[in-house]
């Protein structure tokens, strides 16, 4: 009879124990989640570190750094800002650099003249895609023969599925600009063409040029470095040497003297000329002392 209260008390003491979580009832995945998150963060840091190190790798080492193009432009103060309406305003270097100035030479064919020449050549029946090639072949030929206004050329210029007389191309150029002006416009192109083919003007020896100056034996040699002329894509292969410049200028002076012997006469009437050519212009270079 006394054992029942003992059972009741024992069951009463067991009831609150069920409400308390025992160590075995605690969630077991919390340490696992923490470890996974820590591992993921470490992997992210490792990935970012590798990416940063890869971005810093390079195979160049810049030295003597100096940039002008693309640098931030400065804004001058109000006292130094130029008034565009004042012709005496002082231009800054930045303003001069940004100013678009075309390089012009009055001794070459202009764009308008070249447009007329191209139009007339196309009017002969030359396909438009071959007009530039025909012009270039003409000026290369003139480097071997002459670009004189008195030139009477022979032969024809060929292109794909056709040909055109040289006389026709020369006449068109002489009519609109002058043959020599067109040749001056293409002087750098002709210079590169001769050098890359190792093909100097054909008459260089007959003109008195030495072997080391043979590439200077054409009329428009003195326009090879002119920036107003049409430039090759890569630039000229090499600049003319001093020996080539001296040889060209000497020959040019002799040629001008020979052709200008009648320019000394005030009139070409027989009363002045006596029916003969003017006296030869003589220049004695034997006594030139440049040493």
UniProtKB/Swiss-Prot annotation:
Keywords: Capsid protein, Helical capsid protein, Ribonucleoprotein, Virion. One of its GO terms (molecular function) is structural molecule activity. It is found in: Virion. InterPro entries: Carlavirus_coat_N, Pltvir_coat. Residues 1-14 have a biased composition (Polar residues). The keyword Ribonucleoprotein applies. One of its GO terms (cellular component) is ribonucleoprotein complex. Residues 1-36 are annotated as: Disordered. It comes from the Viruses. Pfam families: Flexi_CP, Flexi_CP_N. Its main location: virion. Required for genome encapsidation. Forms ribonucleoprotein complexes along with TGB1 helicase and viral RNA. Belongs to the potexviruses coat protein family. This is Capsid protein.
């Amino acid at each position: 009879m006394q054992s029942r209260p003992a059972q009741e008390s024992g069951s009463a003491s067991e009831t609150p124990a069920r409400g308390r979580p025992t160590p075995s009832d605690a969630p077991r995945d919390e340490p696992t989640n923490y470890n996974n998150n820590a591992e993921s963060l470490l992997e992210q840091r490792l990935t970012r570190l590798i990416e940063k190190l890869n971005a810093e790798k390079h195979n160049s080492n810049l030295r003597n750094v100096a940039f002008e193009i693309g640098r931030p432009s400065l804004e001058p103060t109000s006292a130094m800002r130029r008034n565009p309406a004042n012709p005496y305003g002082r231009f800054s270097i930045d303003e001069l650099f940004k100013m678009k100035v075309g390089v012009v030479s009055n001794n070459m064919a202009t764009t308008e003249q070249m447009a007329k020449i191209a139009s007339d050549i196309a009017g002969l029946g030359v396909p438009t895609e071959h007009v530039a090639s025909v012009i270039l072949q003409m000026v290369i030929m003139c480097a071997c023969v002459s670009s004189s206004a008195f030139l009477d050329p022979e032969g024809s210029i060929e292109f794909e599925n056709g040909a055109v007389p040289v006389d026709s191309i020369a006449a068109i150029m002489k009519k609109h600009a002058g043959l020599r002006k067109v040749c001056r416009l293409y002087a750098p192109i002709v210079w590169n063409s001769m050098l890359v083919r190792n093909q100097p003007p054909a008459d260089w020896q007959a003109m008195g040029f030495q072997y080391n100056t043979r590439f200077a034996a054409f009329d428009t040699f003195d326009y090879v470095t002119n920036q107003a002329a049409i430039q090759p894509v890569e630039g000229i292969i090499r600049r003319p040497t001093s020996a080539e410049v001296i040889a060209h200028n000497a020959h040019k002076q002799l040629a001008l003297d020979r052709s200008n012997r009648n320019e000394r006469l005030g009139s070409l009437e027989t009363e002045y000329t006596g029916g003969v050519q003017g006296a030869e212009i003589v220049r004695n270079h034997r006594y030139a002392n440049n040493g």
